[in-house]
């Protein structure tokens, strides 16, 4: 445990005492919102961002420890686990360092080096590496085989691999060129600006790299990773491998083998590592932006206590209109055709005016999709009773909600167009309560959201929703099961039980009444009670 605490503390730059407390609480089943709000005395007042960082780092560290145990076992089984190697494996702080140490003992496919070993050329390779041979008295095939073996040894040397990694990090470039036979298409594609693109890896912006990767995946571009002074790097690699006082014949063969190792084995491998690291870094930046965008949408100020006229605009199929009350309940629905092709502005104005008067509606929520601007101009000139203020509302994901099981359960007798318009109106009344019903990825939170690691994106967005819900808290007597499911310690099953109990027994009079809900144990109650409001 101490080893894990120290590793997490190093990764997060947080005090070991606080990190240890957070890990203990997480292992006891506590959630990030609960720890950051109600266990400050144990964590040294770490905030939610810090606690979340510990949770994320802990997962990575435990994965590394699991891999470390596997590597130790595999190397021991191979009979190669010396005390020195064991110490180096136990000290490896990153997965890259660990895999470098494991590389010589990892099961391999058939390679040039393995073929050379089968032919008995390894003793010659060892003599060349010793550097004492004044002349190489062996056949050309034997020398080539020995050099293949030496090249493999060089490629499995952590020091050489790290030299190449540092060179890519310091002097590496990513270059883009048009894919074969796609030059003309590239000129009219969204990626035209990236033709001939060349940028230092350390200066390549996350959105640029994601765009390059997308263009490569779609067949428009070919990407290449280069190092500015490759000959100097190869010379440094040769100088770092083999005995310093090797004879000239041995030195020439060792240098040739190292050069071959760099071009054939090390560089392609490190290129892949570099591309993966760049992608991971770009994903991290993009996912952070997407999470921030989602947080802003979820925490937009609610317009509670207002009765809303909501419109989902459209051209040919008309503008779907609903009236919803202060709680978001559907009062009435209609369809109007105020814009092209019908332009029935008079009929549309009469229908809206009637709905406003009959249901005492005082604000308008207008979806920002197709025909939104044209419909907004119509509303401005319609002369509606009371001149209600018009709010333009994002309708991203409304169509997803309208076809969901949740929407069908709420409005089994209404079609998807009515359900979508209701969602737009509810987003104005209480954005958080409505948007949690939709998969966060369907809300449309960023330009490259489909290019990043989808598992990481889903995890980050789900956490953002949970964080927002718990930062605001919910009214246990009005919250939907979907909203309750994000509360600390509850989850989908218990949320359904709460709603069912509330439906059968009436509103909760106090938090303690929650203990009567089936499956609401002491731990769940402890973790959730502070985030639930009972008016």
What are these regions (language model features)?
Residues 1-20, 27:
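Generic start-of-chain signal for non-secretory N-termini
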Residues 313, 325, 334, 368-370, ...:
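Active-site proximal loops enriched in glycine and acidic residues that flank catalytic Cys/His/Asp
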Residues 29, 313-317, 519:
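A short acidic Gly-Thr/Ser loop motif
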Residues 4, 37, 62-80, 90, ...:
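Long, highly charged, low-complexity intrinsically disordered interaction regions
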Residues 34, 50-53, 60-310, 314-414, ...:
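Duplex nucleic acid-engaging cores and interfaces of nucleic-acid transaction enzymes
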Residues 21-22, 498:
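Short alpha-helical "packing" element that flanks the helix-turn-helix/winged-helix DNA-binding module
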Residues 31-45:
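Feature marking long nucleic-acid-engaging regions of large polymerase/nuclease enzymes
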């Amino acid at each position: 445990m101490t080893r894990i605490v120290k590793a997490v503390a190093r990764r997060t730059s947080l005090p070991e005492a606080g990190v240890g407390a957070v890990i203990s609480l997480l292992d006891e089943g506590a959630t990030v919102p609960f720890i950051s709000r109600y266990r400050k005395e144990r964590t040294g007042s770490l905030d939610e961002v810090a606690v979340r960082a510990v949770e994320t780092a802990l997962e990575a560290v435990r994965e590394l420890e699991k891999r470390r145990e596997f590597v130790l076992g595999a190397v021991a089984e191979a009979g190669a686990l010396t005390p020195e190697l064991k110490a180096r494996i136990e000290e490896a702080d990153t997965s890259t360092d660990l895999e470098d140490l494991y590389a010589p003992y990892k099961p391999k496919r058939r390679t040039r080096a393995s073929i050379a070993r089968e032919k008995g050329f390894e003793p010659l390779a060892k003599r060349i590496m010793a550097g004492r041979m004044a002349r190489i008295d062996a056949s050309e095939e034997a020398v080539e085989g020995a050099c293949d073996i030496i090249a493999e040894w060089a490629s499995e040397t952590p020091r050489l691999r790290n030299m190449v990694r540092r060179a890519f990090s310091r002097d590496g470039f990513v270059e883009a060129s048009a894919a074969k036979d796609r030059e003309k298409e590239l000129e009219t594609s969204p990626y035209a600006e990236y033709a001939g693109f060349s940028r230092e890896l350390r200066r390549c912006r996350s959105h640029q790299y994601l765009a390059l990767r997308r263009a490569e995946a779609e067949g428009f571009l070919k990407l290449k990773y280069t190092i500015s002074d490759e000959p100097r790097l190869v010379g440094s690699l040769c100088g770092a491998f083999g005995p310093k006082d090797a004879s000239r014949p041995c030195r020439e063969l060792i240098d040739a083998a190292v050069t071959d190792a760099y071009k054939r084995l090390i560089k392609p491998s490190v290129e892949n590592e570099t591309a993966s690291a760049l992608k991971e870094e770009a994903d991290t930046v993009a996912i952070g932006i997407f999470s921030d965008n989602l947080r802003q949408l979820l925490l937009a100020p609610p317009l509670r206590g207002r009765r809303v006229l909501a419109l989902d605009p459209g051209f040919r199929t008309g503008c779907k209109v609903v009236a919803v009350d202060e709680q978001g309940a559907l009062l009435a629905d209609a369809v109007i055709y105020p814009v092209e092709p019908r332009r029935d502005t008079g009929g549309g104005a009469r229908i809206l005016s009637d709905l406003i008067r009959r249901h005492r509606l005082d604000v308008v929520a207008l979806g920002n999709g197709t025909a939104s601007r044209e419909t907004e101009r119509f509303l401005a000139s319609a002369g509606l009773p009371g001149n209600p203020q018009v709010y333009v509302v994002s309708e991203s994901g409304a169509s997803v909600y309208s076809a969901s099981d949740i929407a069908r359960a709420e409005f089994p007798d209404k079609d998807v167009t009515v359900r979508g318009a209701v969602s737009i109106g509810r987003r104005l009344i209480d954005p958080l309560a409505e948007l949690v019903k939709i998969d966060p990825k369907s809300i449309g939170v960023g330009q490259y959201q489909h290019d990043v690691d989808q598992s990481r994106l889903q995890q980050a967005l789900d956490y953002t929703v949970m964080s927002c819900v718990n930062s605001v808290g919910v009214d246990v007597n009005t919250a939907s099961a979907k909203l309750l499911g994000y509360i600390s310690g509850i989850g989908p099953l218990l949320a359904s039980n709460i709603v069912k109990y509330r439906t059968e027994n009436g509103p909760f009079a106090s938090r303690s009444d929650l203990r009567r809900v089936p499956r609401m144990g002491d731990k769940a109650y402890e973790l959730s009670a502070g985030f639930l409001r009972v008016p």
